[in-house]
């Protein structure tokens, strides 16, 4: 019998509807339901409670941190807990000041405006946002050249919630206009176990504690990845007719190229570049990106923070350098001279398996 609590696999189950409902159900609806980020939750609770007691809109909020830690969920919780409508957009969708003006002019009093990837807005839109955040008005330019005139447009009071993975890319005048900045951190293992157990209950999936711990150890400290891996484990248990035990979890995650440290195919490609192509480094970000065939921004914002966090890579003024732990994990011997070719230190199958036999 499978760990899944439903009938025969051939039964007509509306999987698409169930999956859509699952996506929405996974998001916590209140700060009390939100797992992890204890300090940020306490700060937000104080901010929202004070605003409610004074019958005013909450201050503008900036949520900063790596992808998948709950920035969008927290924005939705801010709207839910303050009982205000929520409008969602993203920085890449605002490439002209006119795009932002259209969004701002449509806001109703007290509305929460969530801008994901706010650091990717056009500079002209950022400059328009300064006045909107401070005085709830914008200036619309009409005409061109010497005959151009500025027409002020009053806006309804609103709260801006911005999310960014690159807070350093925001200009100081914009950062300074946020009343509160929350810095989200990677999750601890025990917090991830709570996230996985909650999601498993919603999936009606019976899963052993050892299996939960295994997923928590491979999900890069990120709830979004934890939930994604859990769904793959669910699929594996369903297809193979097994319980969601430790062996099933390991088999499923190995099938999807997630190693015991949580490294995926892109992580290993980056490490392969540093270790085998550049002798452990140092190597610059752009050079590394070209060798891997990936965008430099993706490596810097998605891959590198995790590799640095688990101690496989260090950043130096000259570039990225592999640590002794990286050489050990991949079964390679560090070269005597920086930049020299790497050699396998153990059985050839170890390094070959980790690197896809591309040594």
Curated annotation (Swiss-Prot):
Region (Large ATPase domain (RuvB-L)): 1-187
Binding-site residues, DNA: 315, 320
GO molecular function, one term: four-way junction helicase activity
Signal peptide start and end residues: none
InterPro entries: AAA+_ATPase (IPR003593), AAA_lid_4 (IPR041445), DNA_helicase_Holl-junc_RuvB (IPR004605), P-loop_NTPase (IPR027417), RuvB-like_N (IPR008824), RuvB_C (IPR008823), WH-like_DNA-bd_sf (IPR036388), WH_DNA-bd_sf (IPR036390)
Localization of this protein: Cytoplasm
Domain of life of the organism encoding this protein: Bacteria
Binding, Mg(2+): 72
Residue segments, region Small ATPAse domain (RuvB-S): 188-257
Family (UniProt): Belongs to the RuvB family.
Name this protein carries in UniProt: Holliday junction branch migration complex subunit RuvB
């Amino acid at each position: 019998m499978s760990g899944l609590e439903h009938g025969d696999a051939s039964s007509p189950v509306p999987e698409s509807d169930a999956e859509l409902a699952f996506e929405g159900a996974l998001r916590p609806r209140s700060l009390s339901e939100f797992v992890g980020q204890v300090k940020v939750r306490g700060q937000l609770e104080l901010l929202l409670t004070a605003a409610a007691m004074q019958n005013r809109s909450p201050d503008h909020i900036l949520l900063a941190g790596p992808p998948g830690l709950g920035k969008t969920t927290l924005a939705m919780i801010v709207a839910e807990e303050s009982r205000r409508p929520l409008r969602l957009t993203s920085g890449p969708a605002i490439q002209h000041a006119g795009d932002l003006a259209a969004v701002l002019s449509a806001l109703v009093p007290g509305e929460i405006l969530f801008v994901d990837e706010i650091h990717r807005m056009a500079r002209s839109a950022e400059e328009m946002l300064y006045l909107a955040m401070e005085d709830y008005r914008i200036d619309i330019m009409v005409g061109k050249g010497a005959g151009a005139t500025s027409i002020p447009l009053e806006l309804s009071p609103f709260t801006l919630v911005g999310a960014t993975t690159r807070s350093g890319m925001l200009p100081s005048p914009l950062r300074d206009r946020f009343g509160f900045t929350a810095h989200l951190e990677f999750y601890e293992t025990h917090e991830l176990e709570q996230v996985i157990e909650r999601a498993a209950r919603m999936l009606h999936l019976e899963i052993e504690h050892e299996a939960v711990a295994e997923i928590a150890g491979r999900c890069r400290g990120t709830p979004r990845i934890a939930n994604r891996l859990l769904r793959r484990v669910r699929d594996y248990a369903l297809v193979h007719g097994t319980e969601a035990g430790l062996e099933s979890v390991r088999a499923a995650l190995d099938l999807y190229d997630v190693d015991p440290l949580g490294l995926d195919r892109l992580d290993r490609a980056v490490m392969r570049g540093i270790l085998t192509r550049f002798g452990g480094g140092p190597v610059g970000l752009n050079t590394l990106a070209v060798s891997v065939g990936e965008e430099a921004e993706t490596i810097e914002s998605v891959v590198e923070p995790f590799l640095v966090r688990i101690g496989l890579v260090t950043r130096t003024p000259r570039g990225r350098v592999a640590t002794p732990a990286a050489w050990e994990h991949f079964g390679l011997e560090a070269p005597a001279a920086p930049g020299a070719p790497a050699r396998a230190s153990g059985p050839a199958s170890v390094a070959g398996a980790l690197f896809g036999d591309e040594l």
